[in-house]
Amino acid sequence: MAAASPTRAGQAAETQALEYLQGQGLQLLARNWRCKGGELDLVMLDADTVVFVEVRYRLHAGFGGALDSIDGRKQKRLVLAASLFLQKEAHWGNHPCRFDVVALQGSHHAGRPLQWLKNAFEC
């Protein structure tokens, strides 16, 4: 069987993250929300808080693991995209918000649980 493409593997990781977060009580507001500033993998609601979730998948940790791939530049793009989301979806603008990261690593995640970091970074 052929290996999954990086795009397909990333989509599978997003689906796994979404299902996990929904199981934790979060509600999906948007998936793969795109704008000029970038893309938000998942936008979810946790009680009254709008949660911008970046899903990171890495097959190997050779160049740094999934969590290590969220550098300052990526954080700035996420903050910009989140700001644009809140402008466009103004009814969410008065809600508190946070940035979470869900990280998965390994082929079929090698039996490892995903890592969910709430408030992964400040904006």
From Swiss-Prot:
One of its GO terms (molecular function) is nucleic acid binding. It holds the Pfam family UPF0102. It comes from the Bacteria. InterPro entries: Restrct_endonuc-II-like (IPR011335), tRNA_endonuc-like_dom_sf (IPR011856), UPF0102_YraN-like (IPR003509). SUPFAM superfamilies: Restriction endonuclease-like. PANTHER family: UPF0102 PROTEIN YRAN (PTHR34039:SF1). Belongs to the UPF0102 family. This is UPF0102 protein Pput_4400. The lineage of its organism: Bacteria, Pseudomonadati, Pseudomonadota, Gammaproteobacteria, Pseudomonadales.
